[in-house]
Curated annotation (Swiss-Prot):
Organismal lineage: Eukaryota, Metazoa, Chordata, Craniata, Vertebrata
The protein's name in its UniProt record: Gamma-crystallin C
GO biological process, one term: lens development in camera-type eye
Stretch list, region Connecting peptide: 84-87
Origin species: Macaca mulatta
Gene: CRYGC
Functional note: Crystallins are the dominant structural components of the vertebrate eye lens.
Length: 174
């Protein structure tokens, strides 16, 4: 079970909203979000309602302002708790529809280019666990939550292009 508290103002001030479940529309409770406390679990935050727009992965900890979670603004409109599993495994493909060279991964990968000599991933199949795909190496840039399922093209995970820099397992480390 997870628990997150979102605050309208920086440094955990102002009106707040506490949640233990997914919330498709935070605008009902808050007009903006400038700080967050994650008491348990791993959460994905979204800039728009209904789990759309820019995504931000937050683990247990305190985030006194939106720059701490690499946010571009105080616009957080939905959030979801990411389920935890014991094992993680996914397959990367160099072409759409799971064609071309296939590589399998079960650990974090800080640089897809260094490990697999690829700068783009055209399709994915998440076999176990949840992952976050980052557009840049070393877990930077746009983030995309990957749940166990098939992704036949980059648009299936919400990206505009196939640019891929790093992959990280979603694991609650505490």
């Amino acid at each position: 079970m997870g628990k997150i508290t979102l605050y309208e103002d920086k440094a955990f001030q102002g009106r707040s909203y506490e949640s233990t479940t997914d919330c498709p529309n935070l605008q009902t409770y808050l007009s903006r979000c400038n700080s967050i406390r994650v008491e348990s679990g791993c959460w994905m935050l979204y800039e728009r309602p209904n789990y759309q727009g820019q995504q931000y992965l937050l683990r247990r900890g305190e985030y006194p302002d939106y720059q701490q979670w690499m946010g571009l603004s105080d616009s957080i409109r939905s959030c979801c708790l990411i389920p935890q599993t014991g094992s993680h495994r996914l397959r990367l493909y160099e072409r759409e529809d799971h064609k071309g060279l296939m590589m399998e991964l079960s650990e974090d990968c800080p640089s897809i280019q260094d490990r697999f000599h690829l700068s783009e991933i055209r399709s994915l199949h998440v076999l176990e666990g949840c992952w976050v795909l980052y557009e840049l190496p070393n877990y930077r840039g746009r983030q995309y939550l990957l749940r166990p399922q098939e992704y036949r093209r980059c648009q299936d995970w919400g990206a505009m292009d196939a640019k891929a820099g790093s992959l990280r397992r979603v694991v609650d480390l505490y």
